[in-house]
Amino acid sequence: MIFPAIDLQDGRSVRLYKGDFAKETIINPDPVDQASQYEAAGVGALHLVDLDGAKAGKPVNVDIVKRVRAAFTGVLEIGGGIRDKDAVDLYLEMGVNRVILGSVALKNPELTKQVIAEYGPERIVIGVDGKNGKVAAEGWLDQSDVPMTDLIGAMVAAGAKYFIVTDVDRDGTMQGANEDLLGSLQGQFPMARIVASGGVRHLEDIKNLEKRGVVDSIVGKALYEGTITLEEISAFNKENASC
């Protein structure tokens, strides 16, 4: 499945370059309107990131997420600033399908295990962001020495299924996904579902990832640059709806 991404900052839809909060491009001043366009196109899935929340360590763009949920009927996932159970509960009770835990999975694994046990692996997704195979946290502002494989292994053992793996150096660059990293992680953890994020340019990238067993991808800049279209995403997701 392909998830088009909407990144929220100061109430607007933006794109960052390599995760740099200072290097933003405004995509749409009204993210709800953008989500409505995705709904009309029938894409069936949407990836939201609360960038303000990632910096603040708590949900910030809650009202916008609520309005996006009302406008978009497909699978909706949200990440950014979800650091405690209250934040998890807030979004799931709002009707969001999946909540993404990134920093908290690294820094508070016990809480992460608790919410996986309570809500199940279809609703709790682990965000694994970083550079050179090591995990970054706190909106990518804090680069750790923890290998991605350690975090994924611990969370697989806790019952997690979905892992959104973002190569920070590829995000917003249109350089192509890090196929070697993603394919290697999927091969090491066949019971997990690795989701590609960062650098995806077009359907060919997505098909190459599929050959390595990575069947889910997130696209951002490629959509705004026109190298992949909403129509292509919609057709791809309908074709792969059984996955």
Language model segments and positions:
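Catalytic cores of alpha/beta
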Residues: F72, L76-R98, D180-D216
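Glycine/small-residue-rich loop that forms an oxyanion/phosphate-binding "nest" at active or ligand-binding sites
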Residues: D52, V60-Y119
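Conserved anion-binding
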Residues: G11-V14, K18-A22, L92, V96-D171
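Glycine-rich phosphate-binding active-site loops on the catalytic face of alpha/beta enzymes
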Residues: L90-L111, D169, G198-H202, R212-E232
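Conserved, mostly hydrophobic/aromatic
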Residues: D7, Y38, L46, Y91, ...
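Glycine-rich, proline-tolerant flexible connector loops at the mouths of alpha/beta enzymes
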Residues: A45-N61, N108, V165-Q175
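Charged helix-capping and loop-helix junction motifs
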Residues: P59-K66, L141-D150, Q175-S184
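Short, acidic/polar
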Residues: I27-E39, R83-D89, S144-A154, I206
